[in-house]
Amino acid sequence: MAKEIKTIGVLTSGGDAPGMNAAIRAVVRTAIARGLKVKGIKKGYQGLLNEEIIDMEAKDVSDIIQRGGTILGTARCLEFKEAEGQKKGAEICKKHGIDGIVVIGGDGSYRGAQALSRLGINTIGLPGTIDLDIACTEYTIGFDTAVNTAMQAIDKVKDTSSSHERCSIIEVMGRNAGYIALRCGIANGAEDILLPEKYDYNEQNIINNIITNRKHGKTHHIIINAEGIGHSTSMARRIEAATGIETRATILGYMQRGGSPTAKDRYYASIMGAYAVDIMLEGKTNRVVGYQHGEFIDFDIEEALQMEKGINEYQFEVSHLLSI
């Protein structure tokens, strides 16, 4: 018999992502519309352990859909990685009458949700990460905004790079996943794209490419470098020394996490938030919401965590075809 759900909690965990507020809003309003009470848990799992728990009404999420970041705050919590911390979190949920929690975050957040589910708290995970590195879904909350934010900056760097006939290395986020770099590189027309999934790149090939392109009349060269490759500043020095072409590195950093979410991030986050509440009311737990082939779906958390997501080889090939 499915556990009766009367009160749900919602938290954001790990790195913030534009669109998290849209998801929070959807969870709160859908739950209230379905006759549930809602508790907001501040600062992720750390806030749960600290009992930073507030009642939430529909008015509390007014005018947040367009805001970046997360109104609940977020934090990383080492204590919650341990069994004692997880047990404490489940006990606090029961103390506050929380029957289920919607967790918005990445893989690490899912593991925390999985632990709570094993301890009797219904949990549903939503993919909140700008990196698009969750294998069970083609979309993650914040990715589209991060790409658009990075693109605006890259376009500006490209303008000045062209004016000064420079080589420019622009480093974007993606410690273990190169999806932002690949998407931006293709959309910007970059000459080279460096991805963590292709870590065996040859720097001499890049240098040769720059020299060849200059001989063919290209007056500037754009390299999009994922954070997982890194070392953009030292790479710029080596390229300039080898080619004699002025080379500059620009590291975009945390600006990619901020800003008002795009229409796509607002829309998808809203649908996912509502979907999470509804599948919880169906009695589902230990699930994560994803988007595949035009549909919103859900997976067992363990199944989702075991999936592997590689870079799209055809898209990577196209990036080379278009860079000549």
Each language-model region and where it sits:
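Glycine-rich oxoanion-binding loops at beta->alpha junctions
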Residues: A2, L48-I101, G108, I141-N148, ...
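N-terminal phosphate-binding or glycine-rich loops at protein starts, especially the Walker A/P-loop
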Residues: A2-L49
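Short glycine/serine/threonine-rich phosphate/pyrophosphate-binding segments
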Residues: A17-V27, L49, A83-E84, G100-Q114, ...
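Short, acidic/small-residue loops that bind anionic groups at enzyme active sites
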Residues: K39, S117-T140, L194-K198, I251
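Accessory alpha-helical/coil subdomains and C-terminal extensions
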Residues: V103-G105, A115, N122, F143-E246, ...
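Short beta-strand elements at the ligand-binding edges of bilobed clamshell
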Residues: C136-V147, S260-R266
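Phosphate-binding loop/pocket of nucleotide- and phosphate-handling active sites
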Residues: R287-I324
